[in-house]
Amino acid sequence: MGRILAIDYGRKRTGLAVTDPLKIIPGGLTTVPTHTLLDFLRDYVSREPVERFVLGLPRRMNYEESESMTYIRPFAVKLAQAFPSIPITYVDERFTSRMAQRTILEAGIGKMKRRDKALVDEVSAVIILQSYLDNPDR
């Protein structure tokens, strides 16, 4: 039984979150420099079984894809080629960064740590993963 791994893909950094082995509880995994992401995922998947990737899909308020898709789409192709046996599900990621910032603030995290963009990316990935877990039959 594999985990589900969520990806909040960014140009510089990518936040990652993963479920527990029973696929009930999402948790932050890490944030990695985007240029090392595929290598990180290869290493992680070699150690931990992953049964699905959940990739944040940036959309505008009118549900059209945002301009960020110009760099996310090529990554999704590379991800599918690198892991042909692991399906990819796309989840709407609108407002995840704002939600992550609010969550960090409400958790009482100190001001300096709240400015850490890597933490925001990781928490955003957790929110994307929770969104998938709430509605896996999308």
UniProtKB/Swiss-Prot annotation:
Intracellular or extracellular location(s): Cytoplasm
Q: What is the protein's major site of localization? A: cytoplasm
- For this UniProt record, give its keywords in alphabetical order, as a comma-separated list: Cytoplasm, Hydrolase, Nuclease, Ribosome biogenesis
**Keyword Repressor in annotation:** no
Q: Which Gene3D superfamilies does this UniProt record tie to the protein?
A: YqgF/RNase H-like domain (3.30.420.140)
User: What is the protein's known function?
Assistant: Could be a nuclease involved in processing of the 5'-end of pre-16S rRNA.
Q: What is this protein called?
A: Putative pre-16S rRNA nuclease
